Each structure stands twice: as C-alpha cells, then as structure tokens.
Amino acid sequence: MKDELEIEGYKIEGISIGGQETCIIFPNLSLAFDIGKCPPRAVYQQFLFISHGHLDHIGGLPMYVATRGLLSMKPPTIFVPNAIKDDVQRLFEVHRAMGQSELKHNLVGLDVGEEFYIRKDIKVKAFKTYHVIPSQGYVVYSLKQKLKKEYVGLPGNEIKQLKFSGVEITDTLLSPEIAFTGDTTAAFIVDSTNADVLRAKILVMECTFVDDKATVEHARLYGHTHLAEIVKYAEMFQNRAILLIHFSARYEAHEIREAVSRLPEAFAGRVFTLTEGF
C-alpha cells in the first residue's frame, strides 16, 4: 500500500478497486472503513466499520482479527450493519472451528441512525446508502465543549463555582468530520436524512464508473455511482474535500485522472482520487 494522502489534517491510507478490495484507513483515529483483503496497515487500527457483506469489502475480516491476536494486540471493535451481524458471528464460529483459535473481538451491530462513541470526543453514526444488498455508510463526528454565551467574560473563579454547583456552563458542538459511503447509488445524495454526509469535512465516496464505458443506468442497476451523477448534483456537496474511491478495474490510473480533471468548477481544488493498485 503506497498511497498515503493528507487531506484536511487527516492522514488517509488504503486501497479500493471495485470488485476486488476496499479498505480505507484513518490512522489518526485508529479506524478503518471496510477490510477488503486486510492490507497490513489495517491490522493496527482498533476500530473497523463494515459497510456491507460483499467479499471485496469484508473478505479480510477473519485475517484482521487473527493477525491482531497473533501480535498480542487488544481485541478490535468491529461495526457491521445489524442485518448481517448474525451471519458475521457464524463466520467467526466457522473460522474458530477450522483454525482452533479464539479470534477475540467485540462485534457491534448498528442500524441506520444509530451511533457509537469510540472516544468521549468522537462518535460514529450509521447512515442510509443504496446498494443491491443491505448496506450503510458512516459519519464520524467530533464533539467539543464551548462556554455558553451568557458566561463568556465571567472571572474564572465564578465559572468554576457555577460548574461545581451543577450548572451546565458549556454547549456541545457537534461537527461532521468524515463520511464514508461504501457501495451505493447516487440516491444517497438526495436523501434528506443524509445532510451531514454532504457537509462533512471529508467525504470518502464510491465512484465506480467515470466515463461512457458504462452508463448511469448500468451503475444504478448494480448499486453503484457514476461520475456523471456526481456532476449532476455538484451544488449539493458542501464538503471541503471529496476522496473518490472504488473505481472499476477496467480503468487505468490516467483515465481516472483525466475524467476527474474535467469536473466542473464547483469541485475545483477539493476532489482527490485513490488510485493505489491501478
């Protein structure tokens, strides 16, 4: 895995080739989205978020857990769509029987709209996506405390007394930092419940097809997004940065870059591509 990007203050590593493997790593947060074939760097992430059950996104899951155990690392916490949680549990039971190993991990099923705190100042929420099997994306939020307006300017000792007396002196500021779509049609863009996805600081989204080698209708039929639809909805993206992933293996890196270079002015300077492996 050679590609390492730094976007909006976050280091991003990974590989994503449509139909082969997808794993996107944010080492600053010790988390990965999808596990693909379990690239080595993924093993060192404590939290793993799975978008859906296709093998190019979940195939490396047993290896991820087994390798962490081999390295005497803390059992990871793995998040999956609640619809496939039982199947994932059975998957681990089979591998435990075959390999006679413990495969220690914490498995959490999340439904769309449910959230989980991975740190007291970081939470992750599942959002609705539109693939051909049960799927969901994830939004990572940062939480910060800000002194309420009515207490701004008060002496420090008065603020301290208010706090000790049980008065709530701060407001919680919730900011969407990162959104990851997994596999989905462009329908997620116009879903009004996904407003935070389109205003996250960084949006990592699939873009399986980038030119007329495949039609928009073909992309929709197989649960994917075409670059033409991203262009269609250009004004809806409020993100500071958009990282396009999951390009079809039919493309070469230069074809991807050329297609993206033709994006309208609305995307200028904020669209990146992950072309590791192309």
Describe the role of every protein-language-model region.
Residues N106-E114, F188-F278:
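Binuclear metal-ion centers of metallo-dependent hydrolases, dominated by the metallo-beta-lactamase
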Residues G36-P81, G109:
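Active-site metal-binding motif and surrounding structural segment of the metallo-beta-lactamase
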Residues M1-Q46, Y138-V140, K146, T170-T181, ...:
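Conserved beta-strand hairpin/beta-sheet module of binuclear metal-dependent hydrolase folds
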Residues G60-T67, E93, E252-S261:
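Metal-dependent catalytic neighborhoods of phosphoester/phosphodiester hydrolases
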Residues F33-G36, Q45-D56, V80-P81, A179-T184, ...:
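Active-site neighborhood of phospho(di)ester-bond hydrolases with catalytic His/Asp-centered motifs
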Residues I17, I122-L198, I202-C207, D212:
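Active-site-proximal loop/helix segment associated with metal-binding centers of metalloenzymes
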Residues K74-P76, A83-G109, R250-E252:
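Active-site neighborhood of divalent metal-dependent phosphoester bond hydrolases
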